[in-house]
Structures are given as C-alpha cells and as structure tokens.
A protein has these predicted regions:
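NAD(P)H-binding glycine-rich loop region in Rossmannoid oxidoreductase-like domains
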Residues: 1-28, 40-44
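Conserved catalytic-site region of short-chain dehydrogenase/reductase
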Residues: 5, 40-52, 76-81
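Short alpha-helix in the Rossmann-fold core of NAD(P)-dependent oxidoreductases
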Residues: 11-16, 35, 54, 107
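Substrate-positioning beta->alpha
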Residues: 18-21, 82-83, 101-123, 129-135, ...
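Conserved beta-loop-beta element that borders a ligand/cofactor-binding pocket
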Residues: 38, 58-82, 89
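A short C-terminal helix-loop "cap" of Rossmann-like NAD(P)-dependent dehydrogenase/epimerase domains
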Residues: 88-101
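A hydrophobic C-terminal alpha-helical subdomain
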Residues: 164-249
Length: 249
C-alpha cells in the first residue's frame, strides 16, 4: 500500500481495487491460503481516505477469498522503519519536533513479529479473519518521541500542533503537490493524515491478535537501540564518548 497519494497513485486504486484484483487472481489460480495486509483503524465509515480504502480492500478481499487472513498492524518499527527513523532524522536537522496529535496513542509492532504472523497465515496455521497486531506497549505520540530522543541522545523541544492548524498546513502542502505538476510530492503532512491522527492506533479487545497466533510480541526497548544508534551525535561511539567525558569530569 501507500501512505500518501500522488497524481498517479490513489488509495482506492491500490488498496481497494488492487487488493481485490490480487485476491480474485489468487482464487482463480487455486491458491489455498491468502494473507492481506491492512492497518489498524481501517473503517469503511472513516473520514480518512487512507483508512476507508483499507477497509474497502478488506471487504473486497473477503468477497473473493473467503478464507483470507487479514493482518492489521499498528505503526511498524524495524531497521528501515518510516516512523522512528523519520523523527530521528528530523532531530538531527532541527531543534524543534512538531507533533500533530501528541496525545494520540500508538502500539508499535516489530516488523519481524508481523512476518511471523504472515508466515502462519501462509502455512494455514491461522484461522481466517482479522488480526490486529500491536506490540506489548501502547504509548502516546509524544511519549514515543520522548523515548526516541533518549535513545538517540538528543534534546529537542517538542511542539504540539493543534489539529485545526495542522489541517490547514496539510491542505497547503496538498495543494502544492496538486498544482506543482509533479515537482513537489507531499511527504511532509497531508490533510488525510491529520484526520487519521485524531483516532488512537491501538488493538481492539474484540479482535484476534498475536495471542491467537501463539506469538509473543517484541518490546520496543529491546530493538530500537540496535538500529537507531546511527542517529546519535557520535553514532556507535556515543557511549564511549560519554564515558570518556564522565572520566574527565
């Protein structure tokens, strides 16, 4: 799927119609198991085009492939993730970290755990239905950024942006993308993302999850430092530098 629309890539085309076409082809080819990746928050009635398209994709997949296993992860962390790495890079370039929806809760999930769930689905070891996948810890957006700053050893001012102001900013960036004839792609903030950020991104009690798959989710603290160290002031040598500084003092 995609997180941002462009002139050539639309949520509906990829995440709704695209998912439907793949499921139909799988059925026609006699595929026995089908695993579809969606997202927590998928809702056919959502005002977010992203979340609505995810829900539409789920329904279309289920219509074509009755025994489909649908995985809905929260935000994903891992070596090349687009969440922690993005804000860590921002912290290296700016003294301020702007946040939209600082109190919105997330339940970050390790990419390897999602892979394990997918494997169980492919091997027929998961019963059909929707699985919401979240890590063992839920935290607010702001709490996650504070934790990140501690890991990368950087102190930055966190600025909360009200939803109404963020919606205006997102609308401006969206307009720039629309009228720039492809010269600008809005990867900063979209109005649709602002809408999605108004709702917590955590697992539901009435949905299946890792427990039903026999998987114990991995805690963030055991993984984040393994790849985010490169964003520290002295990279992998930061701890040595800090230790030497302590000896001098």
């Amino acid at each position: 799927g995609i997180l941002n629309e462009t002139s050539k890539q639309k949520f509906t085309d990829l995440q709704s119609k695209g998912a439907s076409q793949i499921a139909k082809l799988a059925t026609e080819c006699g595929v026995k198991t089908f695993v579809h990746f969606s997202a927590i928050g998928a809702d056919i009635n959502s005002h977010s085009k992203y979340l609505k398209s995810k829900a539409e994709g789920e329904e279309m997949v289920k219509a074509s492939f009755k025994n489909a296993v649908i995985l809905r992860p929260s935000i994903v962390f891992g070596a090349e993730d687009q969440f922690f790495n993005r804000f860590a890079t921002m912290a290296k370039l700016s003294p301020l970290i702007p946040l939209v929806g600082g109190e919105t809760k997330f339940q970050p999930v390790y990419v390897d755990d999602i892979a394990k769930a997918a494997v169980k689905g492919v091997l027929g070891e998961a019963k059909r239905g929707i699985y919401e996948l979240g890590g063992p810890q839920a935290a607010s957006f702001k709490e996650l950024i504070i934790m990140l700053m501690g890991i990368i050893r950087r102190k930055r001012a966190i600025v909360n942006i009200p939803f109404f102001a963020a919606s205006i900013q997102g609308g401006i960036f969206d307009a720039l993308q629309k009228f720039s004839l492809g010269l600008f792609t809005n990867t900063i903030l979209t109005r649709d993302q602002v809408i999605a950020l108004k709702k917590d991104n955590v697992t539901s009690k009435n949905k299946m999850g890792f427990k039903n798959l026999g998987i114990v989710p991995t805690a963030m603290e055991t993984i984040l430092g393994e790849y985010l160290y490169r964003h520290r002031p002295y990279g992998q040598y930061t701890e040595l530098t800090e230790a030497a500084r302590d000896l001098d003092s």
